[in-house]
């Protein structure tokens, strides 16, 4: 069973944003470029074939705690980036392919804000003793 761990730059909070579509496209392209460099620098190799089914765990390191809906909104760009269209780690980000094993976690780290994703091949459910 393959497990990949990504440390990505913190994506902007999109939940309450009302960006013009051009501004959002610019920010998204900028974030994708920065995130791609982070993945390359980490030494994670591309897979020969995208995962058909995967479970993701997300841990946010933030300035201050946020509502859960804001965390899910922040996951949009990173999960899109994992797909075959961009980086090719998962076939798609639809519920038939990608599931959450746990609610996104959040921790306070004001000096090093980031998003850590753990992508595991297959569908898993983490339980309290298995963290």
Predicted features and spans:
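Catalytic phosphate/metal-binding cores of nucleic-acid and nucleotide-processing enzymes, i.e., regions
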Residues: 1-131
């Amino acid at each position: 069973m393959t497990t990949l761990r990504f440390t990505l730059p913190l994506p902007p909070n999109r939940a309450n944003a009302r960006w013009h579509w051009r501004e959002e496209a610019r920010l998204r392209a900028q974030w994708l470029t920065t995130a791609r460099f982070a993945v390359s620098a980490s030494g994670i190799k591309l897979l020969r074939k995208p995962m058909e089914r995967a479970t993701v765990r997300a841990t946010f390191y933030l300035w201050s705690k946020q509502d859960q809906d804001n965390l899910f909104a922040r996951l949009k760009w990173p999960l899109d980036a994992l797909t075959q269209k961009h980086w090719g780690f998962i076939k798609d980000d639809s519920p038939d392919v990608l599931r959450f094993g746990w609610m996104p976690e959040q921790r306070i780290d004001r000096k090093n804000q980031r998003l850590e994703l753990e992508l595991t091949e297959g569908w898993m459910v983490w339980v309290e003793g298995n963290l």
